[in-house]
Amino acid sequence: MLSFCDYFWSEDLVSGLDVLFDRLYHGCEQCDLFIQLFASRMQFEVSHGRQLFGIEAGMDNLKAVQEDEDEGVTVSRALRGILQEMSQEGTHHLTIASNIESLVLQPFSKWCIEHRERIQYSEKTLLTNVNNFRKSKKYVGKLEKEYFNKCRQLEEFKRTHFNEDELANAMKSLKIQNKYEEDVAREKDHRFFNRIAGIDFDYKTMKETLQLLLTKLPKTDYKLPLISYSLSNTNNGGEITKFLLDHMSLKDIDQAETFGQDLLNLGFLKYCNGVGNTFVNSKKFQYQWKNTAYMFANVPMPGSEEPTTGESLISRFNNWDGSSAKEIIQSKIGNDQGAAKIQAPHISDNERTLFRMMDALAASDKKYYQECFKMDALRCSVEELLIDHLSFMEKCESDRLNAIKKATLDFCSTLGNKISSLRLCIDKMLTLENDIDPTADLLQLLVKYKTGSFKPQAIVYNNYYNPGSFQNFGVDLETRCRLDKKVVPLIISSIFSYMDKIYPDLPNDKVRTSIWTDSVKLSLTHQLRNLLNKQQFHNEGEIFDILSTSKLEPSTIASVVKIYLLELPDPLIPNDVSDILRVLYLDYPPLVETALQNSTSSPENQQDDDNEEGFDTKRIRGLYTTLSSLSKPHIATLDAITTHFYRLIKILKMGENGNEVADEFTVSISQEFANCIIQSKITDDNEIGFKIFYDLLTHKKQIFHELKRQNSKN
């Protein structure tokens, strides 16, 4: 059955959702109209019932009729009886109104309000996440542009300022400079830093001490009095003093307080309670760990993704608030630098500029690389969220239609249970109620308002020098095959080989075929995709190891093939080729359904069979002639896919009811892979993809024999 999850996708994600929610809100308006209908009928029943009750009160001289009735006058008795029946009829109408309100109007109105809230919640959640994703995608595009600009600037600088020999010498100088900086940093770790609480600390020991305080001592947020502002990463004086006594060889509390005071003086701590620069061992005195403490210790700030690295101590301490700490450290580092400059290698101005540009490029590349894969993970999570909410909205819409059906039935029952004279009208209304078909309405919504099939847009990290070398999914087929040094992507061929390996262990043919046709949760597919995406594989064994250790179901492994093909920038059969094939299949349509019929042909059908065979011959000839224009990786990948299923179909035919099972699987796998080989159009439900894949399976030998023959000629 058609599903919301398959037909409300669009390239920007938003336009498909806009169409869907427009129809869902239209459904809410339908519910409001039903509420108006029920309320109007209730008001009519109330008004009509009261009018029937008021007939007796509006008549004159009823007292005389009462006297005549006491005297046994038959006419008066008839009048009294008619009035009583009218009053009884009024009671029935008021009862109907009461039942409509309590049994239909109130519960249905309450349900409609909740239904609208569910739609609003999903709309807000999805649009917020999709819009945030689109903003982040623009940010990644900006990073990509900056990265490529830096690459071009670097290459231009190399071209204009260096020849090949000078560039080689510059690279050697870079290695010498890096080694020199590492040696200086290593030597600096063991130089004297400061005397704290009577203990001499070198740089290394001071870093380790701060790392202990910043990572092992639990931090809290401190809310400043009178204003609604909180400071993060704080401890009170008592906590710091106790931690120092527990973890360091300090004599007593006084020495621990002195240690805390020195941390305050050096600018690692800041007093939070007001103005002052005194450290006190008390729970009432709150202190915040400053950013410079995290920078000095190379510890990531809470909430940041990576530690602060790569800056010299001078640049780090230039931003310190503690002026005394500045003077101490600047003087010591200045002396260290003076000593280091004596042994520093000579670097020209052009080389220095080159190294600076290379550092800037490396930083830009790293940031672009990280954000690219972070965006791809975000894209996967957004798709999973969309799948979940589309399924939820499909259930909500189905529930809405069923709720209208039930409310209509309750409404008709309320009328029919009371007044038999309305039976004919009620029967007609029941007929109308019976004509309500939620499934057909849901199908009509999908067919008329669908925006596109599921086509994930992978976020690709475009490295300037090695495009496609850092991920496997979303890279165009020719690039992937060139990097794999194969004509078929290594992931595709390896998964098919792995499936061939596990087929014998599966209990029966039904399980083997259902692997490729069962629905798989998108999050599980993305989980395995993530394991296979970043690593560059050299042989099938590496992929086999991941597939074996993942302990995922075979159907999940099979789904990765589909997601790989869907994420290709260009489908296996590109759009220009598919347009030609659409015309071909329009002129020579296949009769796929005849493959499922096992009846023998009668003499009167012989002429039709001959016509069909002629159509098939022309269509297949046109198919392999058109496909011959594809590149070698595209043809080889199509061949690998169809070969795998062709062999599986041959195995199925050898089992019990083999031909029937094989024919059913051929149809179902053609439907499953239709969107994987060709990009569908909204109007045709990708019937062309189904027909092409079906022909590739049923005429495989002829088609690929001709394709290989034509390629060998070329």
From Swiss-Prot:
Protein's UniProt keywords contain Calcium: no
Domain Rho-GAP: 475-704
GO cellular component: cell division site; cellular bud neck; cellular bud tip; cytoplasm; division septum
InterPro entries given in the database record: AH/BAR_dom_sf, DEP_dom, F_BAR, FCH_dom, Rho_GTPase_activation_prot, RhoGAP_dom
CDD domains: DEP_fRgd2, RhoGAP_fRGD2
Gene3D superfamilies linked: Arfaptin homology (AH) domain/BAR domain, Rho GTPase activation protein
GO MF terms, alphabetically ordered: GTPase activator activity
Site label Arginine finger, positions: 517
SMART domains referenced in this protein's UniProt entry, alphabetically: DEP, FCH, RhoGAP
Domain F-BAR: 2-441
Biological processes, Gene Ontology terms: cytoskeleton organization; small GTPase-mediated signal transduction
Residue ranges annotated for the DEP domain, each copy included: 218-298
Alphabetical keyword list: Coiled coil, GTPase activation
Self-association state and partner proteins as the record states: Interacts with CDC42 and RHO5.
Role description: Acts in signal transduction. Activates CDC42 and RHO5.
Note in the entry: Present with 1750 molecules/cell in log phase SD medium.
Protein's UniProt name: Rho-GTPase-activating protein RGD2
Name of the gene this protein is made from: RGD2
